[in-house]
Amino acid sequence: IYYRGPLAIDSGSYQGSAGGYNSPHNKNYFKRTIAHNSLLVYDPSEKFACWNYGGSDKTEFAENDGGQRMPGDRWETCRSFKDLLSEEYTVGEVLAHGFGPSAQTPEWTLLQGDITKAYSKKVENARRSFVFFNLTEESEDVPAAMVIYDRVRSSDASFKKFWLLHSIEEPQIEEGGFTVCRTKNGDSGKLSCSVLLPSEDNLKIEKVGGPGKEFWVFGKIFPNAATTRPDPCNERGAWRVELSPKDAAQEDCFLNVIQMSDRNVNKLLPVSRIQNAEAKTVGAIVGSRAVVFSADCGRSSEGYGFEVPASAAKTHKTKKFSLLISGLEKGEWVVERNGKSLGKFSVGEADGTIYLNAAPGKYLVRR
């Protein structure tokens, strides 16, 4: 994420004193899941065989970072297009994608994916959904926001799960979330994250990094000093935020709302969660924009219900919301509010969404 400076980054570096192929920094940190804004599921007994990785400083195994598997025979380079399309090198599937309503200046952009195959058998299911809201018409101070929903199921409840976001400068942990600011090199951006899931009583927020822990992997540091060339921007990064549930469970969900602004902006858009008593949907409101996801990040053929509470009008200072309903099968759907039809809507194959103006109330999406 870049706004008036890099805010959420890929950390580590190929260049440096220890960044090249098969160097400790390269294979244990920089090329691994832990160095990126992704999800970890830590099985303490997992082995990451890497003997066939390129370079001279070979080792039998790489460090256990809790991340995604190393495809191929001991992390061997894929050598043909046929192999690239094989099951071994298949690491994900796009479930839905789209934007609208304008093709030139879309108000929303959606991407949903299944990344289960990127992990070993320690992960039974892993899906991630993004919605980016263009807020330039709504707010001068907060021109953009992103809602990120992750659902992860591990094969063992004891395997700890982590949601990661990397930064150059030190993040600040706050009640219910965190912020990342840019203060150097003429940059002035700020990223503000509101954590809606895990719930507050089950949430641990920790920042990791700083001198001696910039490239930290579960108790070990894999340093990579800068070259003689000046690196005042330090785009290799030095910090990350880790979100994790306190309680052990096979299945966990993460729901985060990220707002982008200038670091001098103190008043952000209000954020709240859309809940569903039957646990079929998960959703969030930021400003006057709202999104509802199918709880399993899949496509529903039957529909579902959810509620935008009356209190949302006061909290968000609006009587109308631009509502994105996702996770629907292709075809014709009816949306009801408080038992009254709002009309029929045609849902496309690629995006699986309905976008409409909506007031608080109880909603039912049905065939």
Q: Language-model features: where?
A:
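Catalytic and substrate-binding regions of extracellular carbohydrate-active enzymes
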Residues: 1-184, 248-264, 272-276
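Short, isolated positions in well-ordered beta-strands
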Residues: 7-8, 180, 188-189, 289-293, ...
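A short, sequence-level motif marking secondary-structure junctions
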Residues: 11-17, 129-134, 168, 196-203, ...
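Solvent-exposed beta-strand/loop surfaces of large extracellular or lumenal domains
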Residues: 14, 20-23, 173-184, 216-232, ...
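Extracellular beta-rich ligand/substrate-recognition surface
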Residues: 116-123, 232-234, 313-315
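Non-catalytic terminal regions with compositionally biased, polar/charged low complexity
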Residues: 135-142, 175, 248-252, 259-367
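Beta-strand-rich recognition/accessory modules
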Residues: 155, 209-289
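Polysaccharide-binding surfaces and accessory modules of carbohydrate-active proteins
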Residues: 161-217
